[in-house]
């Protein structure tokens, strides 16, 4: 609390059975958030939960069919629906290759766990853009931290294995959404995408603006990149 005193503790056994083959019970609880009614929402693996402060689980729901690998963030919208960051199973790319996607899908689910809407980032953005990927410090932010690679940047090879590694194209970690925000003023979502930038996307799945380097964006997105100005509206360079 505000005095620094412990008021509440969740014992790990409540959501962990120590069978690390079971993604739903590994104990990898993420995005623990207190919502308007005082309860906590969080997710792990293929399930998302709601629990009150005395430990009563009020919701234990599986992701909608076809979606996998929840992690990082979920938020509750003003209407009570949830926005979840997930991947998609058996996704068919335009070249015909079928993959499991990595951290590049946002879904809206209702109180029954049913799918309401989807933001399919490979179709909305450009999974081949590699400008931020190539600037990554592999010793600091990649999945398997290796201090020996500190200062080395990622390669983003088009022939890299299809797996959870930084790389271009769907089936690799080309996006890496870290957080979601919702803007009720225009029914849009704002995503912090580690490998692309901070991007606002409308309900119509159109990009409203991009906060980040202008490098590498195609003509479709160039006018969406925000330009820095000072307090007088003068462009900063």
Where are the predicted features?
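Histidine-/acidic-rich catalytic cores in large beta-rich domains
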Residues: 1-237
């Amino acid at each position: 609390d505000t005095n620094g005193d412990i008021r509440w503790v969740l014992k790990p056994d409540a959501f962990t059975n120590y069978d690390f083959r079971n993604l739903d019970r590994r104990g990898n609880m993420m995005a623990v958030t207190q919502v308007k009614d005082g309860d906590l929402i969080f997710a792990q693996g293929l399930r998302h939960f709601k629990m009150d402060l005395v430990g009563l689980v009020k919701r234990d729901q599986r992701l909608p069919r076809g979606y996998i690998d929840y992690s990082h963030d979920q938020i509750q919208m003003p209407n009570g629906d949830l926005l979840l960051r997930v991947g998609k199973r058996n996704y068919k790319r335009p070249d015909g290759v079928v993959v499991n996607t990595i951290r590049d899908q946002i879904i809206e689910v209702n109180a029954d766990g049913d799918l309401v809407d989807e933001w399919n980032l490979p179709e909305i953005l450009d999974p081949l853009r590699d400008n931020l990927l190539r600037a990554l410090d592999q010793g600091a932010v990649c999945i398997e931290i290796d201090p020996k690679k500190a200062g080395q940047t990622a390669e983003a090879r088009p022939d890299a294995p299809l797996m959870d590694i930084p790389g271009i194209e769907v089936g690799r970690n080309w996006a890496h959404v870290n957080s979601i925000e919702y803007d009720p003023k225009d029914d849009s979502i704002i995503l912090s995408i580690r490998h692309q930038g901070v991007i606002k996307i409308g309900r119509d799945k159109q990009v409203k603006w991009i906060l980040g380097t202008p490098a590498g964006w195609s003509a479709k997105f160039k006018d969406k990149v925000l330009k820095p100005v000072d307090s007088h509206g003068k462009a900063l360079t």
